[in-house]
Amino acid sequence: MRINPTTSGSTVPTLEEKNLGRIAQIIGPVLDVVFPPGKMPNIYNALVVKGRDTVGQQINVTCEVQQLLGNNRVRAVAMSATDGLTRGMEVIDTGAALSVPVGGATLGRIFNVLGEPVDNLGPVDTRTTSPIHRSAPAFIQLDTKLSIFETGIKVVDLLAPYRRGGKIGLFGGAGVGKTVLIMELINNIAKAHGGVSVFGGVGERTREGNDLYMEMKESGVINEKNIAESKVALVYGQMNEPPGARMRVGLTALTMAEYFRDVNEQDVLLFIDNIFRFVQAGSEVSALLGRMPSAVGYQPTLSTEMGSLQERITSTKEGSITSIQAVYVPADDLTDPAPATTFAHLDATTVLSRGLSAKGIYPAVDPLDSTSTMLQPRIVGEEHYETAQRVKQTLQRYKELQDIIAILGLDELSEEDRLTVARARKIERFLSQPFFVAEVFTGSPGKYVGLAETIRGFQLILSGELDGLPEQAFYLVGNIDEATAKAMNLEGEKK
C-alpha cells in the first residue's frame, strides 16, 4: 500500500525522471513500445500515452506491460480504447504497477479499472492507494475457523450453506437469475450484517450495472445524502470495454476489498459478476499477445490466472473476504474449461436451473446440483444436516419417479410414492422465495428467513403435518406460517 502526499485525481505517481518510449506498432488494444537501451520497464508496469489525436482531442491511455519482446521492445495491453493513437507517440513508463484508491473514500462510488470515479460525483481522495498486483497472504496468516454465513435465502442456507470467508460460485446459463440473486445477497447482507461489500462488474451489461446502482440507492445500501455511510464500493469494466480492462477490473475490486480486510480488519463481501468474463478477457488478450490457444480456444495460462485472483480471496487473522462469484456456463456445459477451472477454488456452488426457472420457481437454485463443503453435522449441527439430507432424498426420489409419472400417470404409483411426490412438490415450491430486489416485478414484498425458521418449515413438511394443505400455498412465501396463512386464504376464496 502507498500513501501519496497529494490528493490529486491521478493514480499514476509523478516521476522526477521520466522514462520515455515511443509507440512502434498498434494492433487493436495491444501496443508495441520501443524504449532506450537499458531502460526497459518491468512486467505489469503501467505505461501512459498522452497527447492529441488528428482532430485535436486529448488522449490519455493507460497500458500494462505484458511481454518483453527483445530489441528494446515491450508489448502492452491498453486499459481503454486506443482510438486516435498513432505510431511515434510518446509513452511514459510510470515505474510501478497500476494503483487504485482504497479505504473509506471508495464507499458509495463507482470506479473504472484504473480507480478513476465514473459517477460524476467529483474526485476521490487518493492519498491512500494500493497496487492491483500483490501476492496472496502467507500460509501462517490464514484463518482456519469454520462458520456459516447466513444469507436469509432458504434454499441456500438449508442445502448449500455459505462459509464465512469462503468462495461461492453461482453457476447458470444466460437469463436464469444470477445477477438478481447477487443483488438480493448484497441487500440482505447490508441489512442483516451491516457489512461492507465490494462489487466487481466484470464484462457484464452496462444496463445491469446502472440498474444495480439505482437499486442500491433505493434500498439505502448507497446513502446519497451521506455518501461515506454507504456500504458498498462498485468497480465496473463492462462489455464495451477493451479486454485489458475486463481482465484487470476483478483485481481492482479485490484490491479495494483487501484493504478493508487487512487495514480496517473488517469482514468484507466481494461480488464478482461475472468470473467467466474475466477468463474470456484473458483469452482475448492471450490471442492478441500471440500465445498458442489451449483446450476449446482458452488461454494456456488459464489455471495460473484464475489461481492468482482466487488465492488472494481468503480469510486472515485480521478479517475475512467472503466472495460470491457469478459463473456464466457456456451452452449450459459445466465441463467447459472456464467453469471447470473455477470449481476447483470454491467452497460452495449454487447451481441455477433453467428447468426450475421455466416452472417459475425463483430463485431457480437446483437443490440437488448445488453443493457445499459446510454441510457436515460437525459444522451445521445434527438437526440441520438431517433435515437437508431428507429434503434431498425426497427430491431425488421425485426426480426418479418423473419418468414413470410421464408415461403411466400418478395413479399407477404406490401409496408411499404418491405421498413422496406430494411432499416433494411442496418442498420444491417452498424453496422459492420473494426477493426484496424483485418487488418491482413480482408485486410481493421480499422476505428474509432465518436459518432456524427455514429448518422448522422443512421439518413440518417432511413430518406430514402439512399434507392436507394445497401445494400452491407454499409458492413464493417466506416462513412456514405464511404458507399456512396462504392456505387458509385459498380455502376462503374457494368457498
Curated annotation (Swiss-Prot):
Gene: atpB
InterPro entries per the UniProt record, alphabetical: AAA+_ATPase (IPR003593), ATP-synt_VA_C (IPR055190), ATP_synth_F1_bsu (IPR005722), ATPase_a/bsu_AS (IPR020003), ATPase_alpha/beta_chains (IPR050053), ATPase_F1/V1/A1_a/bsu_N (IPR004100), ATPase_F1/V1/A1_a/bsu_N_sf (IPR036121), ATPase_F1/V1/A1_a/bsu_nucl-bd (IPR000194)
CDD domains associated with the record: ATP-synt_F1_beta_C, ATP-synt_F1_beta_N, F1-ATPase_beta_CD
Subunit structure of this chain's protein: F-type ATPases have 2 components, CF(1) - the catalytic core - and CF(0) - the membrane proton channel. CF(1) has five subunits: alpha(3), beta(3), gamma(1), delta(1), epsilon(1). CF(0) has four main subunits: a(1), b(1), b'(1) and c(9-12).
Classification via Pfam families: ATP-synt_ab, ATP-synt_ab_N, ATP-synt_VA_C
Family: Belongs to the ATPase alpha/beta chains family.
Function of the protein: Produces ATP from ADP in the presence of a proton gradient across the membrane. The catalytic sites are hosted primarily by the beta subunits.
Name of protein: ATP synthase subunit beta, chloroplastic
GO (cellular component) term, any one: chloroplast thylakoid membrane
Record membrane topology: Peripheral membrane protein
Matches recorded under SMART domains: AAA (SM00382)
PANTHER family: ATP SYNTHASE, ATP SYNTHASE SUBUNIT BETA, MITOCHONDRIAL
